[in-house]
């Protein structure tokens, strides 16, 4: 219909009408392209929103796990410190016995920081990392990953250096309770046997317990750093989702 109208205007030599027809065509094409562009951008933004929501969930779970790890290692530091004090005096009051038993039971237990990377790995694998427009957010994600990878290397080193001390401490103990047991669950004084007088006189035992505590504290520091980064990352994500 439009073509017939243009041809009629040409035959009539109505050049103004011809120009107007062409402007209508050009404007229609432009609007069509613009609508397609807007639709594509809206789809990209919707995809970014979904990624951010899933990423937020991963980071929130990571924070929860790391907070537990910090608390666990902080508790172990307190247990070990009290146990070392009691070994120095060679007296363990009844109210401290379970704490001392758990200082020995949990000796050297440390955990590296964690970051759930399901969404991050998906973004990298699909080439959609740039879908996240906020460069500060992309940088925060990259730094969080680098911290985890560095901490994993340090954890392996700490584990290797701390193992001889842990082995020595445990060689002086006898566990009386059999059966499966979670490594994070406390035991009772009655679940473990040792010669208190011998341990008090054994300077090597105290040094091994102290060294294991130091290595656990080292990993606790790395988890704390990662935790602070992840809290900051979560704030950036929340700010993006609020836009």
Model-derived features: positions:
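Hydrophobic membrane-insertion alpha-helices, especially the h-region
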Residues: 20-34
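Long, hydrophobic alpha-helical segments that serve as membrane-spanning/inserting helices
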Residues: 1-16, 30, 37-243
């Amino acid at each position: 219909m439009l073509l017939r109208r243009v041809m009629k205007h040409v035959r009539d030599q109505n050049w103004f009408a011809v120009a107007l027809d062409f402007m209508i065509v050009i404007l229609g094409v432009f609007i069509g392209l613009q609508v397609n562009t807007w639709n594509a951008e809206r789809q990209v933004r919707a995809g970014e929103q979904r990624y951010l929501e899933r990423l937020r969930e991963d980071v929130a779970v990571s924070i929860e796990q790391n907070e537990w790890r910090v608390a666990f290692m902080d508790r172990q530091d307190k247990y070990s410190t009290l146990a070392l004090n009691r070994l120095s005096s060679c007296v363990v009051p009844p109210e401290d016995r379970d704490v001392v038993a758990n200082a020995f039971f949990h000796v050297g237990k440390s955990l590296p920081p964690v970051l759930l990377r399901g969404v991050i790995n998906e973004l990298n694998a699909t080439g959609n990392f740039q879908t996240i427009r906020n460069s500060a957010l992309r940088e925060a994600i990259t730094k969080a990953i680098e911290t985890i990878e560095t901490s994993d290397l340090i954890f392996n080193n700490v584990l290797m250096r701390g193992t001889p001390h842990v082995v020595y401490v445990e060689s002086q103990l006898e566990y009386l309770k059999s059966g499966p047991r979670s490594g994070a669950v406390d035991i009772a004084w009655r679940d473990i046997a040792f010669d208190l007088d011998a341990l008090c006189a054994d300077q090597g035992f105290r040094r091994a317990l102290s060294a294991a505590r130091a290595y656990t504290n080292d990993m606790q520091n790395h988890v704390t750093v990662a935790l602070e980064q992840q809290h900051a990352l979560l704030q950036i994500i929340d700010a993006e989702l609020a836009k």
